[in-house]
Amino acid sequence: MLQAYTKAMVKPAERIARIEPYFFADLGKRIAAMKGKGADVIRMDIGSPDLPPPGFILEAMFKSASQPTTHGYTLGQTQGFRNAIAAYYQKRFGVKLDPRTEVIDLIGSKEGLFVLSQVLLNPGDAALVPDPSYAVYSMGAQIAGGNVHLIPLLAKNAFLPDFEAIPETALKRAKILWLNYPNNPTGAIADLAFFKRAVAFAREHDLLLAHDNPYCDVGFNGYRAPSLMQVPGAKDVAVEFNSVSKTYNMAGWRVGMVVGNAEVVKFIETYKSQQDSAIFAPLLAAAETAMLGDQSWLNERNRIYQARRDAVVDVLHAAGLRAEPPQAALYIWAPVPGSEGSMDFCAKMLEDTAVSTTPGVVFGAHGEGYFRISLVGEEERLREGASRISEWMQKRGLI
């Protein structure tokens, strides 16, 4: 009786009841079941780097972890890492940041992406969110009680937003404009001229510009992505999120950062003071070492990613699928041949070929018609996956 009563009484808050299950969690369960039955599944879906960080980063963590004083909370004790972030931005982008007021550490950048909406949006306020995009931009706004106005990212515009097409009614309610370049999932890039226009647009319409920049150090053929903070006056209207996950092969370590507008940085810091107890000191030591240490190894790491990209694209092109090779990030954004929806297309592909890719519609309605291939895995495995995909599409008469 008590159990039945408890079940009847416990109901989720409305803000949580609207949340759908995370796509990759459900996909992971399906793949585990297939592997349990002996399937040789090739994962080309989630963008989790498979390469380890170099030894000097690991050694910094081990050294810190061996000290008795590092096994405690680090609240108020992360200034060393914030100094390292500022030093990285100065050296990498030529951007001067005050590490005391314009920088804060995050338990992974995803935490900050979510928290930003919580500290800025009141019920009825709006966030301008690219479509397709990383789901946390929209979900953070919705959980905060805000509304989401989607901005289409179209191939004809090189997957850049058309600011002039945003309705005035949406602009009047909007407080945040999200950007992400190099882009997930499309692999598109943006130059400083675009960022200058974005800063001017944000200033004109009293918006906070939020730029998610975790792929800035994953580039091909010598490409190096800029930072929004390089635009003069950007700190007046913008913040930028970054992470050690993709740059330093430290996905899962959960160490990120936000830099820029001092007032917004303070809002996030205040929220976090009630939410968490900061990052484990040995992880901070490793991240600090990564950002201040030798960066030359990134060239070889990017060469590996580029070779993977070229291998997959070559196989797809040989089969007749026109997938554009990206200049940055970890993804190939490929068109779904035929009229099948991307969700059904990828589900059928997994069932028939044991190759897992991501349906474009997972990233938004304007992702329909595409599927995303992640370049995380050994080159030969990725080549094998691309071959299975190509043969499967040919057998179905799609290419």
Which residues make up each language-model segment?
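PLP-dependent enzyme catalytic core of the Aspartate aminotransferase-like
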Residues: A4-Y5, S339, K348-T358, F363-I399
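Conserved core segment of the aminotransferase class I/II
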Residues: T6, Q230-V231, K235-R303, D310, ...
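N-terminal small-domain helix-loop-helix segment of the aminotransferase-like
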Residues: V10-G108, V115, M291-G293, M393-I399
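Helix C-cap/helix->beta junction micro-motif
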Residues: K37, A144, E204-H205, A319, ...
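Conserved PLP-anchoring active-site segment centered on the Schiff-base-forming lysine
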Residues: V119-A141
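Active-site phosphate-binding strand-loop segment of PLP-dependent enzymes
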Residues: H149, L153-G222
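Conserved glycine-rich beta-strand-loop-beta hairpin in the small C-terminal domain of fold type I
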Residues: E288, I304-V313, A323-P335, G367
